[in-house]
């Protein structure tokens, strides 16, 4: 089995996957040279790459993993066409993403109470994005919560987001630990 992870970040998922699944060849890519460096430090075969222009031959992988990253891609159809191109017949894409109501309790405190900004690939829109490219699409919903032990943790999380980091100063007084509901979905597309 040959696995490709696109948008591998620091390699945490890749390391965990390889520790519990034996006999796979695992390749990971990320656009950030720093993320590639950190993934390599974990022993991951990580390479600099762009999901919109994969540098692999057609039909190279049995599985492509895309965890919480497809909503960052400027041209989602191009990325999906590349994923389909490198998948072998019978292969699958497993893509995780968040729901539009992710951390509503937090975001309602800042930025005029807006929910999470609309994502190009979310729990709500993911199936529609995948259906033109795959014969079967299954959505598995995961509900939970993030518990932030301190205000510093909440602020650090806000700063880490691409769309809301600049709003950290709008955060009013909060009671900690602070709890925010999570909604995530995993899509399995074949």
Q: Where is each model-derived feature located?
A:
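Local beta-strand N-terminus motif with an aromatic residue
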Residues: 61-62
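A conserved beta-strand element that flanks and buttresses the S-adenosyl-L-methionine
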Residues: 65
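Conserved class I S-adenosyl-L-methionine
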Residues: 92-121
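Class I SAM-dependent methyltransferase SAM/SAH-binding core
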Residues: 2-53
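Short catalytic micro-motifs in class I SAM-dependent methyltransferases
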Residues: 68-69
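A short glycine-rich, Lys/Arg-flanked "PGG" loop and its adjoining helix->strand segment in the class I
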Residues: 77-89
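Short amphipathic alpha-helix with an adjacent loop that forms part of the alpha/beta core around
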Residues: 56-58
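Conserved Class I S-adenosyl-L-methionine
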Residues: 10, 121, 128-190
